[in-house]
Regions:
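Conserved RecA-like ASCE P-loop NTPase motor core of nucleic-acid helicases/translocases
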Residues: 82-92, 399-403, 476-483
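A contiguous, basic/glycine-rich beta-loop/short-helix subdomain that forms a polymer-engagement track
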Residues: 185-210, 223-231, 328-447, 458-459, ...
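Walker A/P-loop
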Residues: 45-65
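A substrate-engagement module of RecA-like helicase motors
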Residues: 2-22, 27-30, 74-212, 216-217, ...
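Conserved helicase motor "Helicase C" RecA-like lobe of SF1/SF2 P-loop NTPases
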Residues: 479-507
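N-terminal pre-P-loop "Q-motif" helix
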Residues: 26-43
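Conserved interdomain hinge at the start of the Helicase C-terminal
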Residues: 389, 448-483
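Signature of the SF2 helicase/ATPase Hel1-core->accessory helical subdomain module
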Residues: 63-65, 69, 92-95, 99-103, ...
Length: 507
């Protein structure tokens, strides 16, 4: 590694954060500067860094600056022209990165000759989040002259000028499913050359895009494609940043686990119906209905709940019937069904078989929503090893950052969950929050709360009294969090007529 270039890159960090950004309204934060130096070293030395960055550090500016300086000072080599990937958990952060952070830094860096041209970024996401122009044309024709909700009609027609489904409000779930890009595009589609989704893919593959932004699920899906030697979803990249990294295990649980809901079963039967296999769809629907009946709680729940899966005699019989029919259908319909529908039949069979056999590689449970509707869920016990194989063995530098990576002053738990325990390239960095908690926070424990039965009206009244006093003390600047919907509703009813400040209840 060229020592002079490395020193120049670190010198630019000092100039950027001590001079250029303050000239544009940002304060100098020593923790942010130290964090950016550590992140740049991680990228230059091909390491993996766990960066615990407290509230108010400005970690997004830190890692974006480190990535841009990597591109500036080390543009050559096999990875020189490759982009970086920034993976987040929330759409809000993705929007902020592409709409605020990158344009702001790009302008300042251009004005001060740090970069020769603007930094270009693009959000990458699944095809089901985009409009299929052919399917949209069919749907618009189908609703012509029909009595349709006006807001939904406007949302549907707005897709003629906006192909990003996430950017349109008021669109019904049914319309969304009818117009989204299908799992497999027909090669004979007459709109293929003018398709907006394919134009998006073409632009995304351009060498001009330096920052690819995606969510954790998309990142893991790309990694799965690479492991299976399928075409990657993302362009080959030279560095990886995982923001909101504490959410990565949740995404991995979804990716490496399996789940089946009533909606999944309904969709599978609908696919068979569309292929004109009406009787097969009816028989399968009956088997699925019996299985759901064996799982249902049959009651409204205060909040979503999960319970361990127990293979009762009724559930065993229902699962056996479903599996038997799925196997028969795969055998009989193999010459006639599209391959992707056959694949759906196969993956449904495999998922149900986990519960029928009690597969010990998975934690099996039932997830109930608030209506009591069940979903069968299987969480992999091998998730850390799967993450390690997917992300950490590819010899690409990576930065994992969040405000909650440490627990009890240690990264031990995070290393375990992320599959990083045996990684030799791993480094830790802690950037303490500049927020003075000792001076600005008070832990208040009321000493006069009487003992009340849990869930009682008396409990709600006592809590309401304390909350009203605290709201008065803070002049309305209060957020009250509950672990129970029913208790929240009861307290809300107690306080709503007593406050002079605006009150909002969020479910």
């Amino acid at each position: 590694m060229n020592i002079d270039l490395k020193e120049q890159a670190h010198g630019e960090i000092e100039r950027i954060f001590r001079i250029l950004l303050p000239q544009n309204g940002l304060a100098v934060r020593e923790e942010q500067i130290a964090l950016c130096h550590a992140m740049l070293d991680t990228l230059l030395h091909n390491k993996i860094a766990l960066c615990d960055a407290g509230v108010g550090i400005g970690k997004t500016y830190a890692y974006l600056t480190a990535c841009i300086l990597l591109k500036k000072f080390y543009p050559s080599g096999p990875a020189g022209s490759q982009p970086v990937v920034v993976s987040t958990s929330s759409v809000a952060l993705q929007d902020a990165i592409i709409g605020e952070y990158i344009p702001f830094l790009s302008r300042i860096f251009l004005e001060n000759h740090i970069i020769p041209k603007p930094i270009r970024a693009m959000v990458r996401k699944g095809k089901e989040r985009f409009v299929c122009d052919a399917r949209l044309a069919q749907r618009l024709e189908a609703v012509k002259g029909k009595n349709k909700n006006e807001e939904q009609r406007k949302a549907l027609f707005s897709l003629q000028s906006n192909y990003d489904l996430d950017a349109v409000t008021g669109l019904s779930g049914f319309d969304r499913r009818q117009v989204c890009v299908p799992k497999v595009c027909e090669k004979t589609c007459r709109l293929r050359n003018s398709c907006r989704y394919h134009q998006y893919l073409k632009e995304a593959r351009s060498a001009e895009i330096f920052v690819q932004i995606c969510n954790h699920n998309y990142l893991l899906a790309d990694a799965a494609h690479r492991l299976q030697e399928l075409r990657p979803l993302l362009n080959d990249y030279r560095a990886l940043v995982i923001d909101e990294a504490h959410k990565l295990p949740d995404a991995a649980r979804q990716m490496y686990g399996q789940s089946l809901s009533a909606e999944d079963f309904h969709e599978l039967c609908s696919l068979l119906t569309k292929e004109k296999y009406i009787l097969a769809a009816q028989n399968l629907r009956e088997k699925f209905r019996a299985l759901m009946g064996a799982l249902c709680r049959g009651e409204l729940l205060e909040e979503a709940q999960r319970t361990a899966f127990v293979l009762t005699a009724e559930r065993e019989a229902a699962l056996r019937d479903c599996l038997s029919l799925l196997r028969v259908l795969q055998k009989q319909l193999a010459p006639h069904l599209p391959r992707w529908i056959l694949h759906r039949l196969g993956t449904t069979e495999q998922a149900l078989n986990l519960f029928f056999t009690g597969d010990r590689r998975y934690i099996l449970y039932i997830q109930y929503d608030r209506t009591g509707s069940p979903s069968l869920c299987a969480a992999s016990r091998q998730m850390p090893e799967q993450l390690n194989r997917a992300l950490w063995r590819n010899n690409i530098p990576a930065i994992l950052t969040s405000g909650t990576l440490m627990a009890g002053g240690s990264f031990h738990r995070t290393r375990q969950r992320m599959g990083l325990s045996s990684t030799q390239r791993l480094e830790d960095f802690i950037a303490e929050s500049p927020f003075n908690y000792r001076e600005n926070c008070i832990l208040y424990i009321p000493g006069d709360l009487p003992k009340t039965p849990m869930g009682s009206e008396m409990e709600a009244k006592c809590l309401a009294e304390q909350i009203c006093r605290l709201v008065d003390a803070t002049h309305g600047h209060t957020l009250v969090l509950f672990t129970s919907y029913s208790l929240m509703g009861a307290v809300y009813n107690q306080v709503k007529g007593r406050m002079v400040f605006p009150l909002m209840e969020v479910w």
